Amino acid sequence: EYYVNQKHLDNLLWVWNSPEAEGYPGDEYVDVISRDIYLTEKKATDYKEEYEEIIANTTNQKVAALAEVGYIPDVDMLKKSRIPWAYYMSWSKEFCIGEQYNTVAETKKMYESDYAIKLEQ
C-alpha cells in the first residue's frame, strides 16, 4: 500500500520468491513467481523440477524467474525443455568471476544464444 497509495506508483511488478506454498499471498497479489537456487555441486540443469514446484503454488499461469542462482542454467537443456524462465541472476563475486562455478565459456554461450534476449532486440 505504501508504494501505491503514498508514492502513487502504478507500474509495479510484485515478485514472490519462495518454493513454499504456505507463504504464497495469492494470485491477485503476485505478478512474478521466483526462487533462489544454490546447488551443492555443479550439474547441467534447466531447473525443471524447481520450475514445476513454484508454478504448482499458483492457480494462474505466472511469469517465472530464477531470482538468484549459483550455477547458471544449461542453455542447451533450456532450448530442449522450453522451460520459460523469464530471467536468472547469477549471484556475485565467485559465481560470476573465475571458473569455479560458471566458466567464461558457459556464460558466453548463454549470452550469445538465441534463447537470451539482448539489449539490441
Listing of model-derived features with the role each one plays in the protein:
Residues 7-9, 25-29, 58-59, 80-82:
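Extracellular/periplasmic catalytic domains that process cell-envelope and extracellular macromolecules
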Residues 61-121:
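Substrate-binding cleft of secreted/luminal carbohydrate-active enzymes
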Residues 1-22, 61-72:
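Aromatic-lined carbohydrate-recognition surfaces of secreted/lumenal glycan-active proteins
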Residues 16-24, 45-54, 70-79:
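Alpha-helical scaffolding within the catalytic cores
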Residues 10, 49-56, 76, 105, ...:
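Polar/charged alpha-helical tracts
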Residues 2-7, 54-57, 88-94:
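Structured segments of extracytoplasmic/periplasmic soluble domains
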Residues 19-43, 90-93:
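Aromatic- and acid-rich polysaccharide-binding/catalytic face
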Residues 35-56, 61-62:
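Substrate-binding surface in catalytic domains of secreted glycosidases
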